[in-house]
């Protein structure tokens, strides 16, 4: 098997790399297109091949968004369109690996989900208003900004992607106006001299309190993680003195929340929607060069920070090659960002105080506990970790119905050594350690490009799950824990209307019922993105960085202190429809989307049907898209050809509803 895999890898290497340019260069051809494909193995041999491809991703210009954990489990791979994609498909097909298109043009997905009219929030601005997909047909929006606690002075654009300077300004403003419970902590600086800052939230006490650590954005491209961490900050501060349980949290514990551990990488991903920039994973450490197989040298920069901690470092799930996305660094704690975490948690202020360590990532909807360096390897207190994790995902699901799975990273994804969560458990002996992979679930195609409409719902539900971890810490220390969702939490299920819950449950029931019976067609297929469910269960600044920090501070001070709260946003459930075909390689996926794109928020939406059907008021018989009538008009057979998709999205128009049949 090894010989065959090596032969296949050599063939891929020869085909894909002749004449290619090193993946590390920061000069990109804006005409290049990248696709996201799903691949799944059918035996151990093909699974081994996929994993070997990931370890050698830099050789083949591949970007693994998600690794396969087992046979039939899908991997998500971003690959350059054209020759690279065709040849990779041929090789994988020969190795008995199923390949299917997920996103034909990743850059268009980026612009559709993350484009904004505010250049201060997102570097590449709004270039694709017409690319927006149709919203779900709802009489009222699912997104409720009232779930974001109001702070009189400190404002942050929740529901949008903002700059690192905006994050720091927001935290500093909170410290200024809420000094009794909030204090800025600077744990270190990056390669480029940016400060790594977080917020300590806790009421003053005469004794040393137990602590909870939360971090986000250790991987540059995982934007939703920092937004969620900032929401944690907002809720703990805004609800202090209002919500009895949160007041108890802040009085009893100290929370240390660092929203962005990788500011250099995060800011780099904001500079362009080009996939190789937006999907950058590592930090921005200086270039390292290695001899090239084709002569000369390959020079690449960046280290995967979540492979750089001292826990079975460099053993599995990482690479010695600087050009790899999972490069673990020259040595353990080689990076200023990881040293900053280590050194701060070893200070007298923090040593032996931390009872919970939560690190936020995306994506897959997973609640992960140690250990992740190898399969079926667990800490001694695994029972308590599982019990709390189960409570957390159950509580999370009661908010919007989003289902998470739980397990170790090795058991649910694939083995990966050198992670911060495993290090916190083994080296710091933290009791409750969790890595949370946020929305979307693994089966959906948006991946890291989470639509802005889903940011607040993601944060709201994750905070509810996080509260179970805090309750466990309080119980561990014999303190009064939260009395739960049913007893008055401000973000409890009670804040969600019955209509909203019915809509969420209806969507999930339809999608879940169709998932098991879906089949692959050789004709054009529709692939849909929804929010729904899983089917299962030393911190020193390097020399010559002062000028970078001065420039960063100048940028910070030049912007206004507070940003107004954004207006009511559209519905959170925003499926993205992608068209793909096995016969036409360069098909323009925007053909139908352009015809049915939505207008601006201030515009009244129209229907392709003559009137708004009264049956839409019946949650058992309704269309979920504006475009159902348009699709049927342009293809009379679409209901039969795309039955699974159309049954879920256009039940009324296609006359799939039992209530429709009874009336007619």
UniProtKB/Swiss-Prot annotation:
Disulfide bridge partners, by residue number: 621-657, 628-650, 639-654
Region (Disordered): 512-590
Taxonomic superkingdom: Eukaryota
InterPro entries on file: M14A-like_propep (IPR036990), M14A_act_pep (IPR003146), Peptidase_M14 (IPR000834), ShKT_dom (IPR003582)
Keywords carried by this UniProt record: Carboxypeptidase, Cytoplasmic vesicle, Disulfide bond, Hydrolase, Metal-binding, Metalloprotease, Protease, Secreted, Signal, Zinc, Zymogen
Gene Ontology molecular function terms on file: metallocarboxypeptidase activity; zinc ion binding
Keyword presence, Signal: yes
Tissue and organ distribution: Localizes in stripes along the cuticle.
Comp. bias intervals (Pro residues): 564-573
Record-annotated Peptidase M14 domain positions: 160-473
Entry GO terms, CC: cuticular extracellular matrix; cytoplasm; cytoplasmic vesicle; extracellular space
Propiece residue ranges: 24-110
Cofactor names: Zn(2+)
Keyword Signal in annotation: yes
Knockout-associated phenotype: RNAi-mediated knockdown results in a slightly shorter and stouter body.
Variant or mutagenesis effect after changing residue 407 to E: In jg34; Shorter and stouter body. Abnormal localization of the collagen proteins rol-6 and col-19. In mutants lacking rol-6, suppresses body rolling and restores normal orientation of alea
Residues in ShKT domain copies: 621-657
Top enzyme category: hydrolase
Localisation per UniProt entry: Cytoplasmic vesicle; Secreted
EC number: 3.4.17.-
Extent of Low complexity compositional bias: 512-543, 574-583
Major location (coarse): cytoplasm
Family: Belongs to the peptidase M14 family.
Listed name of the protein: Putative carboxypeptidase suro-1
Native source species: Caenorhabditis elegans
